[in-house]
Amino acid sequence: MNLKHLTIKSLISGLLSLTYLVGYGQQKDNFTLSGKIKKQNFDWIYLRYNIPSGGFVLDSTKIINGKFQFKGRLNEPVVASLYGKMKSQSMDDPNFTSVFLEPVPMTIDVTAGEFMNASIKGSQSQDEQKILEQLKAPTRREMEPILEIYRNEKNNEKAAEIKEQFEPFNARMDKIDYAFFASHPDSYVTAYMMRFKMSGLNSNQATKIYNSWTDRIKQSSYGKYIAAEIKKLENGSPGSTAAPFSAKDINGEQLSLSDFKGKKYVLIDFWASWCVPCRKGNPHLISIYNKYKESGLEIIGVASDDTAVDAWKKAIVQDKIGIWRHILSGYNRNASEQEKSAYINVRYGIHTLPTKILIDKNGIIIGRYGGGGEDDAAMDKKLAEIFSIN
C-alpha cells in the first residue's frame, strides 16, 4: 500500500470525451460550471463527482478559446474533482483541484499548473470551505517543510515514521475543524469534513456532533453516511455484542470467534504489516499475551494485508507474533457494497490502525483501544482487573 500519496487512478485511466452515468436516478436540479483557463497547454478538462444513489459522473469537455463549460443535474451539493492533463496520480498534482458543486450556475477561473488556486463563484458551500481552509492555512504553512520530506521519501516505512511528526499540526487543525462544525450545523461542508474525523472519535463524540446538525444536513448523502458510520462504531464499542466472523487462519485452519465463547477473553488486534505504530506495539502485545494466556486470554490478529500476503507472513515472523492466531480482514476491492459490509473491519467500525477490541467470555465487547477508543494504558488496566479477579 502506498502511504505517501492519495491517488486518483480511477480518474486518469481511460479518460475519453464522454460522460459515465452510473445509478443516476435522483438528481433534479440543473447546475452549470462555466470556466476560463489561463496558460492553457492541454485541450481537455475533466469533472468527476459522486451521486447520492451510489454511482458517479465522469464528464469531459474540450477547451475552446480558453473557455469550457460543464452541465449536469444535482439534488444537493457534492464535492467534485476538476483536472486537466496531469503529471502524476497525486491529488497534489498542479492540474488538479476539488470544488463544491451546487445545483446553481457557477463560474471558475483556473490557471494551468495552478489549479489549487482556482477562483470559484456561485457556490455557498465552496465559500464556506474557503473560510475553513483560510483558518487552517497558517498551520499548513508551518507543516509544509515536513510534508515535503514526506513526499520525497520513497521508503514506505520511513515515510510512515515521518508522518508521525504531523500529529501536533493535525491536532491544531482538528480543533479548527470542530469549531467550524459547531458554528456551521447547517453546512454541507461540516458533514463532508466529518467523514475524515471518524477515525479519531468514539461513538458518543460522533453522535454529539451529528445530533447538532439540522435535518437538512442529516438527510444529505454525507449526513446519511455519517449516521451509518456511527452505527458501525457503536457495533464495535463496549456494551455491544461482538460481531461473529469465521475465516481461515495463517496455517489454513478454520477460526471462528464463536470458538472462544464461554471459554476465553479475546483481544482482537486490527493491524497491518505496513502500519508502523502497529509493529512498534507488538513487543508490548507479546508481553500481554505471555502474562495472561494461561489465565484465559486469546489474541486474534486481523490484518489489512489481503493484497500483500507475503508481507503479512514476513511481519509475523519478524515480530515473533506467531504465538497467537492470525487471519486476514477479507478485503476484496472488487466486491459488491453488500459484500464489503460483511468485512470484519467494517463490522467493528475500524477506521484506523492499530485498533484493539476486547471481548469477554459472553461475547460482549468490554473495551476498545485506539481508533475511537481508549489508549493502551487503559487496556493494560482493564486486563489487570479482569485477571486479578479470575
Where would I find each of the regions flagged by the language model?
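Short, small/polar residue-rich loop motifs at catalytic or cofactor-binding pockets
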Residues: G55-F56, T241, K264, H351-L353
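A non-transmembrane, solvent-exposed segment enriched in polar/low-complexity residues
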Residues: G25-R172
